[in-house]
Amino acid sequence: MMIPGHFDYHRPKSV
């Protein structure tokens, strides 16, 4: 499962 939103909350790569 690769969700570009589920993992974003877990690992903020944008920050």
From Swiss-Prot:
Its cofactor is FAD. Keywords: FAD, Flavoprotein, Oxidoreductase. Catalyzes the oxidation of carbon monoxide to carbon dioxide. One of its GO terms (molecular function) is carbon-monoxide oxygenase activity. Its EC number is 1.2.5.3. The keyword Flavoprotein applies. This is Carbon monoxide dehydrogenase medium chain. Binds 1 FAD per subunit. Heterotrimer consisting of a large, a medium and a small subunit. It catalyses: CO + a quinone + H2O = a quinol + CO2. It comes from the Bacteria. The gene is cutM. It is an enzyme of class 1 (oxidoreductase).
